């Protein structure tokens, strides 16, 4: 992967971090107008914040695992950028729940806010679309070098696809403007990273699993 591509990823992550504080403040006023109506616990806004915080936490975990399993600087830098960006966004989502006075957990199944109440229970710890199973996480921890790189890129590609599905749901259903904008930003950034990871897999003689 070229230095230009790596620079783009790093720049994107930095831009998200710089914008984080402004978005967190803006959600209280929702763009500078009158204060937005506080979402309730069963709203799409609250459901997305709760579920995406969990989804992001796994991406952070996978990224730090692969950084310990390979010395490849391209993969290590991408993993670091993903971990930092998603950890920051996770903090914002949990912060909004605090701001709204809402619980960070719900008795409802994951994805209920998207109208997916009938979704079957997650298999082997994979609670939401794109999430890796516990077995897959253990496998990632057991691999080294190129094998770890390929498996991480495959897992993260699927993770991003699931995340995009969820973020598109918020962009459509959420009411808080700042949260809708953050969700759309996730869609755009993660789609670009999927394309980037496809190229990295090709360089390693591999391809996405789906």
Language model segments and positions:
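All-alpha RGS (Regulator of G-protein Signaling) helical domain and cognate RGS-like helical scaffolds
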Residues: 2-210
